[in-house]
Amino acid sequence: MKYKWLIFILLLLPSFAFAQKSEGVLYGKITDNDGKVIELVNVAVQNTSFGVVSDARGNYNLTLPADTLINVVFSFVGYEEIKIEVRLQNEERRRHDVKMKVTSTLLPEMTVHDQSIKSSAITRIDARETVLLPSVGAGGVEDMVKTLAGVSSTNELSSQYNVRGGNFDENLIYVNGIEIYKPFLVGSGQQEGLSFVNSRLVSNIDFSAGGFSAEYGDKLSSVLDITYKKPTITASSLTLSLLGAEAHTEGMAFKGSMNYLIGARYKNTQYLLGAMDTKGDYKPNFADVQGLITYNISSRFEITALGYYSRNSYLMAPTTRETDFGNLQASYRLKVYFDGQELSKYTTGLGAISLNFSPNEDLNLKFIGSAYSAVESETYDIQGQYWIGVIDLNNEYNGEDHVVTNQGVGTYIEHARNYFYSRVYNLDHKGAYKYRDNVLKWGVRYQNQLFDDIINEWDMVDSAGYTQPHITDSILNPNNPMQTPLELKNVANGHNELYINNLDGYLQNSWQFENEKGGIWVLTAGLRANYWGYNGSVNVSPRAGIAFQPAKRPNMTFRLSGGVYVQPPFYRELRMFNGDLVSKDKASVQKSYQVVLGHEYQFKAWDRPFVLTSEIYYKYLTDIIPYEVDNIRIRYYADQKATGHAYGLDMKINGEFVKGIESWASMSIMKTTENIQYFIDAQGHILSQTDINNGADYVRDTIITGIPRPSDQRINFAIFFQDYIPYVPSFKVNLKLIFGTGLPFGPPESQRYQQKNRMSAYRRVDIGFSKQLISDATTFRNPRNPLNYIRNCWLSLEVFNLLGVNNVSSYMWVTDIYNIQYAVPNYLTNRQLNLKLIVEF
């Protein structure tokens, strides 16, 4: 079997936990200041996901390794967090009662590292919430991010998301301060494997939808900043489901001098893809393994090593497809019979070494060296013979609608031999210095990029017996016809090798002070600068943010942030449709001038804490590169430039809709458009910049304004909701709902200004029903029962796409006998079930 090594790891990891036989029990009762018991308090080992919750009587039982100094954290929404240090003897039972105090800060999600108030909105997500989240996508963390305000996604099979009118390439992702990159050739959600982020290894998740400070890098839209755990106890987990398996282990070694964190995952979506419209032989196999090891040389100096390896393979041999589309007035059925197959492979790796040195409590210095590489291939030869017919909805034949009119037949062939290799080296230095009420941060990075891209792809369409597009036959001399080469569609052919050296850095200061009336102010100002080696351009990005909390209304915070954000092209933005790279003089660094005004209101309803957050924003975009999206594949008009804007309103309310458990709902209203320069020739035809670069003549130029960008989703609404049976918290329900209005699209080979059609709205509900079979408080009569080594065990039944909505990922364009094009929807996954078993040791 191809993944024997992964199965071996999955079976081996639980044995690490079984070896920990020396244990003790910490137990007690948790009450408030008035002596009332508090249920559902999280009692956990610091910086881990291992813990228990108090029951309806406020009691808790936490099993801990013996002879180990451990920090235990007691936390609950609306109460101050309590930390204790404990060292238990073998088989010791120690009672520790806890009295919790009500805190003025209602929700712990709204915390910040350097100040109690943030100058720009940062949303913190509890990583433990991703464990029971129903998900078919590539990552639980990204699926949680999709429910936040300002974020939109219309493909559950992908971990990609849009933020405030931006595209997938405009989002920064960091893991332990290291920038994460994505595969280049992935073109559909079915091909996308596992995201880099392993939710089982995560400690903190911070997300900003815009207006972020200068310490974060050069992207236009968002930042997802993830910190992996630094374990203090030994623990493991194993998850099995119909979609794959994952396992992890964590702990300490060498008397606490070393911390280790290892995770492995395997995913197979054959079960999901087999129920889609296109039938055939699907063999998607995605696997990865990653580890984080920290060695503490002293209390002030540590070395951290992060390693990641991923191997993804997607084989599809389609046989048939049947899709109904249209409306009540005109309904059609498309049938396709296929030959051929597609095979895509993606192998990626990342290694990083980080040196963290703190000469004193106020100064921290970090040095990071990282290397990323990816070897990707996309090969396919697929022939489809299609048939279009009109469906008669009024009359049934054998209980089914039947086709009464043959509308067209045709054949198409898709061919690709694409190979891509990338390598990115980074050398970083970051520092932070605290003095008085100030925090000074700085950083500098050198980056070396290498890309080797071989592309060879084309399409051919033959409708009604002739090839499209075709050369007009010669009627002057039919006995000696013109010998002309076959013309193909969407031809891209080339071999590009590219070396780029980049340099960037930042300087930022934050300070907090009070005014005469006791109001608290936090001001952050910084400056970023980068040198882009492709064309030698230098860009400067000033950014600032200010927050104010009135003394008379400490439950309110007002924020204003913004600045200049630039994004040098990585590689995708440099490649034109024909496979060539744009010339250096025409390459542009995209820029965005942003301003964000926000308000945060903390209140209580039903005697429970809530937070209402709202932000309005405006972005002026300049030197942006127009693009189009097919499924999740982005293709840039690399030799064109545009200006544009995006503006909108984001709102989110989160709190205890159900006592003791946090849920939230978010809504976003947004509009984003762009203005593109076109040219008019002598016959009045509209030409693009690409046509002019290819030698076309024109009479005058014109600016077409108000073109909806491909990410122009006007309304987006999302809910993340948790519930449990009263007094029986072992029965839980997790629900995720996403609604988004349709995105713009247009026919193939059309210009951007022509792509104004709208997809149908994206509507999806995923729900999971979970039962905790074993908890830390569960005891068994036989002390030798192997189940005693299980700390938590959950069994979940997940229902994907509960409403059974046919959501659209993209369109297949076919032509009938009248030369009319039809946009046939490519539907995403339908309603399906998944069974998941989660075991924590």
Positions of the model-derived regions?
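Gram-negative outer-membrane beta-barrel transporters
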Residues: F513-K517, Y618-Y620, D639-P744, I838
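Transmembrane beta-barrel wall of Gram-negative outer-membrane proteins
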Residues: S237, L243-Y266, K279-P318, E342-A371, ...
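Short, acidic, small-residue-rich periplasmic hinge/interaction motif at the N-terminus
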Residues: K29-D34, V41-Q46, V73-E80, Q89-P134, ...
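Extracytoplasmic beta-strand/coil segments of soluble accessory domains associated
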Residues: E142-K182
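Membrane-embedded beta-barrel scaffold of Gram-negative outer-membrane proteins
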Residues: K366-S370, V589-E656, L795
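Surface-exposed extracellular loop regions of Gram-negative outer-membrane beta-barrel proteins
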Residues: T319-R321, A551-V595, I616-K641, K736-S750, ...
